[in-house]
C-alpha cells in the first residue's frame, strides 16, 4: 500500500497541510518542535485510529480549534485507490471512514494499512515496564491476526470485570468470579499461544538485523515469560483469587506477560550503552517490518523519526544501506541533520521527495536544494 497524498487540518501544530508523497522515500528536515513528528503521527493515526503518543484524541486538536481532520489517499498494489478519513470534534465521537463508509468498530480497520514506526519514544521498550513490551507484541500480531486482536479485547474486558469484583466491599459469589475467569482463560490461552509462536519466529529475524547494523559486535536475544506456560490459566486465576482480593486487582494472567530483552545473557536495560540500546530498538522495529511484510498481504509503511540519534558513524552507515535498499517499501524519515538525509538520497537514486518543516508549515524542496 502506498500513501499518495495526505490532507491535514488542525492536527497538533499542523494547521493546514496538503502534500503528495514519493512512492519510495520521503524526507522531512527541520529543527526540533517544528512538526516533523506530528506529520508522521498523522500518518500513524490513519493506520491505528489513534496517535502514537497521546491516546486522548481531543488533546491532539490544534490549540483554540474545535476539530481535526486527517485524510489519506492510498493506492493498493493492484492500483485500487483507497481513501481513509478521520475526523474528531471536541465533545463528540471520533469518526473513521474507509471510502466514505464509517467503521462501526475501530478494530475492524487495524491491519488494513500495516505500519511500523521507529521513534525516540521506543526507548520505553527497554526502560519502561512490562506493559510497554506487551504492547509491542500486541501491535505486531494484531496487524496480521484478527483472532488475536479479538481475543485480546475479550480478555481485557473480562479482566476489568474481575478487577471490579475484587474491589467489591461486599461478598461476591464464586460463580460470578468463574464467569469472568473462564472468559479470561479461554481468551488468554489464545493470546499466549499466538505470542509464543510469534516470538519463536521473530527472534532470528531480529538477530539478523542487529548483527548487520552492529557488524556482529554483540549478540542479542529475546525470551517470553507467561503465567500460562506451566499451568492452566483458569487454575492460575482461581488459585490467585484470595490474594487478588486482598490486593484489589489481578496479580496473575497474560496481562502480566514479560518479553525479556537481552544483550548477551543479561538484560539490556542494565547492560546496554546508549548506542547499543538504540541499535537494539532500531533492529527490533526493522525486524517488525520484515515480519509483517512476510506474513501480510501488503508491504507496511515505514516511519523513521530521528533514527540516527545516539548512533556512531558506522551504525548510521549500516542503517543507511538497509533503508536505501529494495527490501523496504514506502519510507517516511525525519532528521534535524540534512546531511544524514542527503547520504541516504545519494544511495536511493531519483525516487524521493524532500520537505522542509518550519512552525507547522511543510514545503517540498526542489531537487537542486
Curated annotation (Swiss-Prot):
Lineage of the native species?
Bacteria, Pseudomonadati, Bacteroidota, Bacteroidia, Bacteroidales
Query: Which molecular-function annotations from GO does this UniProt entry contain?
Result: ATP binding; single-stranded DNA binding
Q: Which family does it belong to?
A: Belongs to the RecF family.
InterPro entries assigned to the protein according to its UniProt record, in alphabetical order: DNA-binding_RecF, DNA-binding_RecF_CS, P-loop_NTPase, RecF/RecN/SMC_N, RecF_2
Q: Which Pfam families match?
A: SMC_N
Source organism's superkingdom?
Bacteria
Any single Gene Ontology cellular-component annotation = cytoplasm
Whether rRNA-binding counts among this entry's keywords is no
User: Where is the protein localized?
Assistant: Cytoplasm
Identify the species of origin: Bacteroides thetaiotaomicron (strain ATCC 29148 / DSM 2079 / JCM 5827 / CCUG 10774 / NCTC 10582 / VPI-5482 / E50)
Record's protein name = DNA replication and repair protein RecF
Role of this protein: The RecF protein is involved in DNA metabolism; it is required for DNA replication and normal SOS inducibility. RecF binds preferentially to single-stranded, linear DNA. It also seems to bind ATP.
Q: Can you tell me which residues bind ATP?
A: 30-37
GO BP term (any one):
DNA synthesis involved in DNA repair
Does the record carry Phosphoprotein as a key word? no
Instruction: Provide this UniProt record's keywords sorted from A to Z.
Output: ATP-binding, Cytoplasm, DNA damage, DNA repair, DNA replication, DNA-binding, Nucleotide-binding, SOS response
Entries under NCBIfam families matching the protein: recf
Amino acid at each position: 500500500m502506498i500513501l499518495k497524498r495526505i490532507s491535514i487540518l488542525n492536527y497538533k501544530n499542523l494547521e493546514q497541510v496538503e502534500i503528495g508523497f514519493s512512492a519510495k522515500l520521503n524526507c522531512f528536515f527541520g529543527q526540533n518542535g517544528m512538526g516533523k513528528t506530528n506529520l508522521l503521527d498523522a500518518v500513524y493515526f490513519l493506520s491505528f485510529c489513534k496517535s502514537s503518543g497521546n491516546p486522548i484524541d481531543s488533546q491532539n486538536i490544534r490549540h483554540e480549534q474545535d476539530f481535526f481532520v486527517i485524510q489519506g489517499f492510498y493506492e493498493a498494489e493492484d492500483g485500487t485507490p483507497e481513501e481513509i478519513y478521520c475526523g474528531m470534534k471536541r465533545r463528540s465521537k471520533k469518526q473513521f471512514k474507509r471510502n466514505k463508509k464509517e467503521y462501526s468498530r475501530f478494530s475492524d480497520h487495524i491491519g488494513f494499512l500495516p505500519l511500523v514506526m521507529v521513534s525516540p519514544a521506543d526507548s520505553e521498550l527497554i526502560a519502561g515496564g512490562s506493559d510497554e513490551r506487551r504492547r509491542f507484541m500486541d501491535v505486531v500480531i494484531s496487524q496480521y491476526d484478527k483472532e488475536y486482536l479479538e481475543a485480546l479485547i475479550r480478555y481485557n474486558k473480562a479482566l476489568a470485570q474481575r478487577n471490579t469484583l475484587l474491589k467489591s466491599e461486599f461478598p461476591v459469589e464464586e460463580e460470578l468470579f468463574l464467569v469472568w475467569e473462564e472468559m479470561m482463560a479461554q481468551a488468554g490461552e489464545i493470546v499466549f499461544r499466538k505470542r509464543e509462536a510469534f516470538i519463536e519466529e521473530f527472534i532470528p529475524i531480529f538477530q539478523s538485523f542487529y548483527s548487520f547494523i552492529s557488524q556482529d559486535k554483540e549478540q542479542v536475544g529475546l525470551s517470553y515469560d507467561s503465567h500460562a506456560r506451566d499451568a492452566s490459566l483458569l487454575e492460575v486465576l482461581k488459585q490467585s483469587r484470595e490474594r487478588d482480593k486482598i490486593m484489589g486487582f489481578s496479580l496473575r494472567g497474560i496481562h502480566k506477560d514479560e518479553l525479556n530483552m537481552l544483550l548477551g545473557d543479561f538484560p539490556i536495560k542494565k547492560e546496554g550503552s546508549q548506542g547499543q540500546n538504540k541499535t537494539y530498538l532500531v533492529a527490533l522495529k526493522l525486524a517488525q517490518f520484515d515480519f509483517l511484510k512476510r506474513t501480510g498481504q501488503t508491504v507496511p509503511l515505514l516511519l523513521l523519526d530521528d533514527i540516527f540519534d545516539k548512533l556512531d558513524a558506522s551504525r548510521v552507515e549500516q542503517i543507511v544501506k538497509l533503508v536505501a535498499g529494495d527490501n523496504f517499501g514506502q519510507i517516511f524519515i525525519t532528521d534535524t541533520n540534512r546531511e544524514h538525509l542527503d547520504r541516504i538520497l545519494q544511495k536511493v537514486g531519483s525516487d524521493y521527495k524532500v520537505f522542509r518543516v518550519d512552525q507547522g508549515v511543510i514545503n517540498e524542496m526542489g531537487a537542486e536544494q
